[in-house]
């Protein structure tokens, strides 16, 4: 099996070929997802909520992320692997480089940072030092205390224009990929069309180049509140996890998921 690369993702964008991605936190699920056809995985700091039981991602440490990144890499050696940089691990460019190096040594192909144009100096520094970067705009869970909860972002014109400008700035600084979370579908389309780098959506409609879900949401095993944008693919697959992942891939690639019911206006 060939290793998935960023060059492939850029080619898929040019070809308008949509792709499905998932979070993974251990070797077993990573291997299972890869065997069903998932080619891009994210070791998300969402593990703070899904695995550790916290009510936010803020308590997650770089050591936590490195541990799970190593596990996922062993399970899916050929996937393009992203790893979240947790809260306050990239407060300065120097700190970001130190922690990004740790995650890269653990097996990540790329690190993901949450934030707008204030991150440009950090992204530029990382890119110059051969650390590939994925940006993250819209609802950025590490900023939950500022947002006052997990709310849709970019609904007002001023906020939408700012998000678009931030996306452009991140790309110009050297970001190779962008995650766009919980924004109106019209804004997601503007961002996706404006950028030359691939855009992965979560709660951003079916107009982005790729889609990502937290694995627990895709399998319907999330406790408590279920996000509007999620779909329980396991429930549509007679309880067969492998069939559920294949269905998720098929619906993303076919533009079926996310449907209007999963989309914010």
Curated annotation (Swiss-Prot):
The keyword Magnesium applies. Mg(2+) binds at residues 45, 84, 114. It comes from the Bacteria. Pfam families: Pantoate_transf (PF02548). GO terms for cellular component: cytoplasm. Its cofactor is Mg(2+). Binds 1 Mg(2+) ion per subunit. The keyword Cytoplasm applies. Its EC number is 2.1.2.11. It is found in: Cytoplasm. SUPFAM superfamilies: Phosphoenolpyruvate/pyruvate domain. Pathway: Cofactor biosynthesis; (R)-pantothenate biosynthesis; (R)-pantoate from 3-methyl-2-oxobutanoate: step 1/2. It catalyses: 3-methyl-2-oxobutanoate + (6R)-5,10-methylene-5,6,7,8-tetrahydrofolate + H2O = 2-dehydropantoate + (6S)-5,6,7,8-tetrahydrofolate. Keywords: Cytoplasm, Magnesium, Metal-binding, Pantothenate biosynthesis, Transferase. It is an enzyme of class 2 (transferase). Homodecamer; pentamer of dimers. This is 3-methyl-2-oxobutanoate hydroxymethyltransferase. It comes from Yersinia pestis. The lineage of its organism: Bacteria, Pseudomonadati, Pseudomonadota, Gammaproteobacteria, Enterobacterales.
